[in-house]
């Protein structure tokens, strides 16, 4: 039996013992060494050869990832580790640290129960560290900490043991501050990471060594030994004395929960159904004999097998030939192949039971986030993404005969990555692709060329703006075209606290399942409870409230009013850009008794025009997306980089020096950031390391707004002059 077969046999045996399984991920800020850590863990567990690890970046198996040196797709690998004489199955999901791929991180978090948070010892906790940790804690994923690149503190910064320990203490304090802030109430203290119990390890993923207090106690290796061996350059002895995979995987087995433990507290939070039902109990108990339920976390296209859906099995057993329901898409499907991952390689199995990560084919048209079950059940909570698409490009096929293929390719990309928004316009042949940033879109366009062999024309990137209001409007009347229906509404700015709660997922988007609970939450955040009681719908960071009393036939048209509200929010009055942070209130209505006279053709224009007219009376403004830009540069380039940021309407937020390196944190409008990579390379002779993350929206300065509105309107084929109130409000 070869090594590979032996490994598969072991994995098969352990898959049926949930107490021996750990589903875990590794998450970090970009370039903090996440993929190098993953690869050396795999090498240690015998999945790839040690010579290749760290150079090969085995999890970066997309050729583009290898070229860019950043992880783009969350890949999954199963491996075996022995701890205190027992074998454990560890399913490792590698996630990207680059903000443009934040959606992948969110989806991976749904599948795992624990995460190693990697922090660079030199840079410390960075903005993206906070983002990934917040995502983990929101999904009830327990963290442990690995402090990486300790060799740089010894060799480059020449710190002594005490200074190094002070550095560790600061990082641990920073991480614990975030855990206290973002962890679920019941785990705020329980999940804090501590050096003493081994929930913190430190080392160098690149040089393949690590230490933790339990390991030091067990083996007698001291930190002093490490400093001496590093300074002497004796890396071989270092690796033998303190092997990375042993220390880190021991920490994983000891501190991260198995599926039996984790599902007890994760299922009530992640699933909206009745916990006391048979299927609810089967998931809470991770029961392989229960009804099969899995959640798809990723879709990839395999040249031979077609669409492969990776996901977490919460209850029951996934088997070949099983007939299943795709709950969100309201469709049936039949599972064709069932398997697990070992790196990019998929190994087929007859069945995979609850508590494992599975790869299946046959779920055509499933999207990431889909709930799959053998019977119709409540779906899992919608996955919550931290960023929103802010950059758009228009794409056209150069060759008309490629049009059907392009549409198919765009649909496929959207299915694999729900953070990518695709708008297909079959009439004009011009399709819009919106993503989290320039890099996100570049990667997708590259795939159109290489995987789909498509030749496309791409417009320069366009920024997605938002429209909003600055004050409360008077009551505005909206009349239906036949004059038989009238709606009286106001709009006003949505308070910041409520907008943030919607963005954070504390107030769910959509029609509330439990309006009383949502009204209570709105009241806690400062809205008058009498007004909040009228909550009807939450849509893209806007809310619609019904504050009428006893209006006849209102319930019959409420669905149409909500649709009309969506239309008004999708395209605001200034430049047909999406609307954000607006509260729309319905105060009164007169509705025709005969439903022939109150159909969509009457209700939509009435409510849409009323909302837009009210917005024009409420001080309409334009918001633009901002990015936080984190740049590491040698000290001498400080001046040229500051100039580069200032020229782009950017602001410096923070600066700190670490040895020879300056870390600059700034914010700048996305519109000014195109081509920044090249300019920065030029300004620093290629010596800058940088990353970005979404920093929300800010109001466009008045002196720029008129021009921007003109440009957007012109691009959309509208009259370029910004509309005035009388252009939008119907003359009475």
Swiss-Prot record:
Localization annotation: Cytoplasm
Residues reported to bind GTP: 28-35, 94-98, 148-151
Domain tr-type G: 19-260
Gene3D superfamilies hit by this protein: 3.30.230.10, 3.30.70.240, Elongation Factor G (Translational Gtpase), domain 3 (3.30.70.870), P-loop containing nucleotide triphosphate hydrolases (3.40.50.300), Translation factors (2.40.30.10)
Xref: PROSITE patterns: G_TR_1, G_TR_2
Residues carrying Diphthamide: 597
Primary localization: cytoplasm
Family to which the UniProt record says this protein belongs: Belongs to the TRAFAC class translation factor GTPase superfamily. Classic translation factor GTPase family. EF-G/EF-2 subfamily.
NCBIfam families cross-referenced by the UniProt entry: aEF-2 (TIGR00490), small_GTP (TIGR00231)
Protein's name in the database: Elongation factor 2
Gene that this polypeptide is encoded by: fusA
């Amino acid at each position: 039996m070869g090594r590979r077969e032996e490994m598969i046999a072991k994995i098969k045996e352990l898959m049926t013992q949930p107490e021996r399984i750990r589903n875990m991920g590794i998450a970090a800020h970009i370039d903090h060494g996440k993929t190098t850590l993953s690869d050396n863990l795999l090498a240690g567990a015998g999945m790839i050869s040690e010579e290749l690890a760290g150079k090969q970046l085995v999890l970066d198996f997309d050729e583009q990832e290898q070229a860019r040196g950043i992880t783009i797709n969350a890949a999954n690998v199963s491996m075996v580790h022995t701890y205190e004489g027992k074998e454990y199955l560890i399913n490792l999901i590698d996630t990207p640290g680059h903000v443009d791929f934040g959606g992948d991180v969110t989806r991976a978090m749904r599948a795992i129960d624990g995460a190693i948070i990697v922090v660079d010892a030199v840079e410390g906790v960075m903005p993206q560290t906070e983002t990934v940790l917040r995502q983990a804690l929101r999904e009830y994923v327990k963290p442990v900490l690995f402090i990486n690149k300790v060799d740089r503190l010894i060799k480059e910064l020449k710190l002594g043991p005490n200074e190094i320990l002070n550095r560790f203490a600061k990082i641990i304090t920073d991480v614990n501050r975030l855990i206290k802030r973002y962890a679920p109430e019941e785990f705020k203290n329980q999940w804090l990471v501590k050096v003493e119990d081994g929930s913190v390890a430190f080392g160098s993923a690149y040089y393949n060594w690590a230490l933790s207090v339990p390991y030091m106690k067990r083996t007698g290796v001291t930190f002093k030994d490490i400093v001496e061996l590093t300074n002497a350059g004796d890396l071989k002895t270092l690796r033998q004395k303190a092997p990375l995979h042993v220390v880190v995987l021991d920490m994983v087995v000891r501190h991260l929960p198995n599926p039996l433990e984790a599902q007890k507290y994760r299922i009530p939070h992640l699933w909206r159904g009745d916990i006391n039902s048979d299927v609810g109990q089967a998931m809470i108990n991770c029961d392989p004999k229960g009804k099969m339920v899995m959640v798809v976390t990723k879709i990839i296209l395999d040249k031979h097998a077609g669409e492969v859906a990776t996901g977490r099995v919460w209850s029951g057993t996934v088997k070949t030939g099983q007939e299943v329901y795709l709950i969100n898409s309201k469709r049936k499907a039949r599972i064709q192949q069932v398997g697990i991952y070992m790196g990019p390689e998929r190994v087929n199995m007859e069945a995979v039971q609850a508590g494992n990560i599975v790869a299946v084919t046959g779920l055509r048209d499933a999207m990431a986030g889909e709930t799959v079950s053998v019977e119709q059940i409540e779906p899992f909570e919608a996955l919550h993404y931290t960023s929103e698409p802010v950059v758009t490009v228009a794409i056209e096929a150069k060759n008309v005969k490629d049009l059907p293929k392009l549409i198919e390719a765009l649909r496929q990309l959207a299915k694999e990555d729900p953070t990518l928004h695709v708008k297909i316009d079959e009439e004009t042949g011009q399709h819009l692709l919106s993503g989290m940033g320039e890099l996100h879109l570049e990667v997708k366009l590259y795939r159109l060329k290489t995987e789909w062999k498509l030749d496309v024309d791409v417009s320069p990137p366009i920024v997605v703006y938002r429209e909003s209001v600055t004050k409360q409007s008077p009551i505005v009347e909206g009349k239906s075209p036949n004059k038989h229906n009238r709606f009286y509404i106001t709009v006003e700015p949505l308070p910041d606290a409520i907008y943030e709660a919607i963005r954070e997922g504390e107030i769910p988007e959509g029609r509330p399942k439990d309006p009383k609970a949502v009204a209570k939450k709105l009241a806690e955040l400062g809205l008058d409870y009498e007004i909040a009681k009228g909550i009807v719908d939450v849509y893209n960071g806007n809310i619609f409230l019904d504050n009428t009393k006893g209006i006849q036939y209102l319930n019959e048209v409420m669905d149409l009013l909500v649709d009309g509200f969506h239309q008004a929010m999708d395209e605001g009055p200034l430049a047909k850009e999406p609307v954000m942070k607006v509260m729309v209130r319905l105060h009164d209505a007169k509705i025709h008794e005969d439903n022939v006279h109150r159909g969509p053709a009457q209700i939509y224009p009435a409510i849409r025009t009323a909302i837009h007219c009210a917005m024009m009376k409420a001080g309409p403004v334009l918001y633009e997306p901002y990015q936080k830009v984190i740049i590491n540069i040698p000290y001498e380039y400080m001046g040229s980089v500051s100039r580069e940021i200032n020229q782009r309407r950017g602001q410096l937020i923070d600066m700190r020096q670490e040895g020879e390196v300056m870390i600059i944190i700034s914010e700048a409008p996305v519109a000014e950031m195109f081509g920044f990579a090249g300019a920065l390379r030029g300004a620093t002779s290629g010596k800058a390391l940088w990353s970005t993350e979404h920093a929300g929206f800010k109001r466009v300065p008045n002196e720029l707004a008129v021009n921007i509105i003109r440009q957007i309107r012109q691009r959309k084929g509208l009259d370029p002059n910004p509309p005035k109130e009388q252009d939008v409000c119907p003359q009475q």
